[in-house]
Amino acid sequence: MISAIRPAVRSSVRVAPMANTAFRAYSTQDGLKERFAELIPENVEKIKKLRKEKGNTVIGEVILDQAYGGMRGIKGLVWEGSVLDPEEGIRFRGLTIPDLQKQLPHAPGGKEPLPEGLFWLLLTGEIPTDAQVKGLSADWASRAEIPKHVEELIDRCPPTLHPMAQLGIAVNALESESQFTKAYEKGVNKKEYWQYTYEDSMNLIAKLPVIASRIYRNLFKDGKIVGSIDNSLDYSANFASLLGFGDNKEFIELLRLYLTIHADHEGGNVSAHTTKLVGSALSSPFLSLSAGLNGLAGPLHGRANQEVLEWILEMKSKIGSDVTKEDIEKYLWDTLKAGRVVPGYGHAVLRKTDPRYTAQREFALEHMPDYDLFHLVSTIYEVAPKVLTEHGKTKNPWPNVDSHSGVLLQYYGLTEQSYYTVLFGVSRAIGVLPQLIMDRAYGAPIERPKSFSTEKYAELVGLKL
């Protein structure tokens, strides 16, 4: 049984109001679980008030094309952590990516935000102190060990099995450790669901670097295990160490940035929605995230970062890296005329350059300005929007997050493209699991939208087929 939540000493630290965001305070509890427990009654009352007073208010219309077009634009999900504006990009609890880079805690001597701080922000809506983030890092480190049967399961995977498939298998296998499932089977009160979901989520996030690095070392480094979890290090530094990059401070900084900006992107994308959907059936965080990771593995979602780099390397092999804009323009047109897409460009919601792309570009300008692949990516950025606009078949000719990440990883020696989506998966857990905890705390029901056949839709719109 999980022990009762105990009050902790309050902090008096405050942060000043910011433009375009509500006033926010540093969290007032030393422990994340304790602080979230404080917030639950207030947030539940807000939801009750909203539904009681405005529950019958129309919030949007649905046209037939949306039903056949992937449900894009339909307002039908609740996602607290982030909101995506087509013109501005993503905001995490009201904060832009530059806001996160400035205001979330950093590692000593570092410039990039720690993903632990983002997790705290997403769950509470508050910016944690340095001490609170350090405590969260240590908490995750203390939970990182994985069961023997999960180690053996990963080690038995054939080298032909994609890293994302291995990741999904391993996360599913952690179901044996689920506190939520065990508590549910014992008949725990539903008001306590969130506590067990919290514990599972914390354990899962903590174990992902160990799982992900074992997959990497098995597939690409002959199974030689390096590094170990150090309770004094942050999450990204430990992950980098397990991968074999623990001595590279720049790579660790990149990993901090990568894990932060890939974590959350509203709730309607495949991995986020799948995790939330499966969780709504009261499946544990392990089963729910595993389902989300299987969605992330798809080429139209997270696997796109692998395909972008493969395409860039293919371009380089054909036209070289010391190329002109005219060379790239011709190559882009040849790609489009062959019926292929230009990977890394376009987005289901965004209509401007993805701020996550911009953050990675700024990192590259600081750390690798003369790198030939960065030069190639930059030149593509100058040419592709014009070509795609002239081609006329995309609503968004601007680069997305996948357009840049692979090049950064290549620079530091993580060259195995098939592994890139695994890094995305580790990051995505940090973004989607806070919502799963909130769903259980706020009593979110199982999802069950209505579906119709084509014949029924035709009847609804008055058309005889």
From Swiss-Prot:
This is 2-methylcitrate synthase, mitochondrial. It comes from Yarrowia lipolytica (strain CLIB 122 / E 150). Pathway: Organic acid metabolism; propanoate degradation. Oxaloacetate binds at H265, H347, R356, R428, R448. It is an enzyme of class 2 (transferase). One of its GO terms (molecular function) is citrate (Si)-synthase activity. One of its GO terms (cellular component) is mitochondrial matrix. InterPro entries: Citrate_synth-like_lrg_a-sub, Citrate_synth-like_sm_a-sub, Citrate_synthase, Citrate_synthase_AS, Citrate_synthase_euk, Citrate_synthase_sf.
